[in-house]
């Protein structure tokens, strides 16, 4: 949206979201959502992001003095836009290489048809399987034992449709798929029967699988085609996802992802430059590109060499590490909740409290504040709280005055402090305020409930015994 455009409310009917469908990124989709093809290895030129570089201004910016060249938004308004890198040769996706191997075991290397035919005794049962993931695994279990394309079953010596060609044995080692082809005694050229399958070769085979065979394997032709499991066009995340940190006046520390994208660009440009040279030089540059693309996605794969910074040797934090686990984006940021104005202590029982009451220690009540707007009805009470100040309960800690100016009552003379209608007083917690009380693990909605505050001496939360059941609480220190 360009600056100055007047926002108008949509006239579309409200719809209920029933489900979210995930799929694989189509190279055409990556091209469509990209605003720039990234090919310049240099990130900055005299402090300004280079055109076609990893921090090209068309992808957005985190610099306060600059604006996004695509939407004209500043660092607060622009969420960023994706770019892309055209790879000189396709590479394996580290998360899908096992899946690629499974699919290759299910199709013929020559005609690219399924190794299992409708004459097979398990064909009908496999066709009835609905779960896509389960379906691929079941088809793989049957096809991995089929050695010749077109045989009706393992014991049959008669061929149905198919090429009749013997199939290679496949195994994954690191970021490679190794193929061992059967030796033909009449053909001496088959003696050297072991070789690595390139991602380009696998891409051609997967791309030639028919729509019907893809569906039989459990793939969706709109959301996830088999050939999309191999990377031929790499999306580049926008700079707001990987902001740089200024260490001094002229020193800029780039994010790990930016560093990795730069390494990918260097390896990709070197590979493109040497495509017409000797095979061993091409292979060396290709393996480097494969390594950097893999460690951009996952740098913690077992048995895989770790990508590190050249200075300091610190391991790169890859995309997977940012998403997974308790500290990741999903559990740590999206699902995890962090709040201000909260307190934590041990609970003890108090049968004298009402069911909806919560005994709160005075020390906590003096620390947690509630903002209350000054009105004609409460101005006298607010003045008393301000006079009591932050160290006498019930009192107040801050005043938010005209223009949002904050006054800390720890340093002000409370008796001389002026308040007026519309001011906001950050007052202490007092009796009959409503608060939310939570005990982990929060397994159901009754793990967080509302209570009326009753300020009490000592240092523990007090709770009526009859309220402990929904919290699954006891009084042994939990």
Swiss-Prot record:
Give the main location: nucleus
Q: Name one GO biological process term.
A: DNA-templated transcription
Which superkingdom heads the taxonomic lineage of this protein's source? Answer: Eukaryota
Quick one: which residues bind Mg(2+) 2? 474, 476
Q: What class of enzyme is it?
A: transferase
Residue numbers binding Mg(2+) 1: 474, 476
The keyword Zinc is annotated on this UniProt entry: yes
Q: Which reaction does it catalyse?
A: RNA(n) + a ribonucleoside 5'-triphosphate = RNA(n+1) + diphosphate
Chain sites annotated for binding Zn(2+) 1: 68, 71, 78, 81
Q: Name one GO cellular component term.
A: RNA polymerase II, core complex
Show the InterPro entries listed in the entry: DNA-dir_RpoC_beta_prime (IPR045867), RNA_pol_asu (IPR000722), RNA_pol_N (IPR006592), RNA_pol_Rpb1_1 (IPR007080), RNA_pol_Rpb1_clamp_domain (IPR044893)
Q: How is it modified after translation?
A: Phosphorylation activates POL II.
EC annotation from Swiss-Prot or TrEMBL: 2.7.7.6
GO molecular function per UniProt? DNA binding; DNA-directed RNA polymerase activity; metal ion binding
UniProt binding sites for Zn(2+) 2: 108, 111, 149
Keywords (alphabetical) are:
DNA-binding, DNA-directed RNA polymerase, Magnesium, Metal-binding, Nucleotidyltransferase, Nucleus, Repeat, Transcription, Transferase, Zinc
Q: Where in the cell is it found?
A: Nucleus
- Print the miscellaneous field: The binding of ribonucleoside triphosphate to the RNA polymerase II transcribing complex probably involves a two-step mechanism. The initial binding seems to occur at the entry (E) site and involves a magnesium ion temporarily coordinated by three conserved aspartate residues of the two largest RNA Pol II subunits. The ribonucleoside triphosphate is transferred by a rotation to the nucleotide addition (A) site for pairing with the template DNA. The catalytic A site involves three conserved aspartate residues of the RNA Pol II largest subunit which permanently coordinate a second magnesium ion.
Q: Which family does it belong to?
A: Belongs to the RNA polymerase beta' chain family.
Q: What does this protein do?
A: DNA-dependent RNA polymerase catalyzes the transcription of DNA into RNA using the four ribonucleoside triphosphates as substrates. Largest and catalytic component of RNA polymerase II which synthesizes mRNA precursors and many functional non-coding RNAs. Forms the polymerase active center together with the second largest subunit. Pol II is the central component of the basal RNA polymerase II transcription machinery. It is composed of mobile elements that move relative to each other.
Q: How does it assemble?
A: Component of the RNA polymerase II (Pol II) complex consisting of 12 subunits.
Protein name, please?
Answer: DNA-directed RNA polymerase II subunit RPB1
Q: Which gene encodes it?
A: RPB1
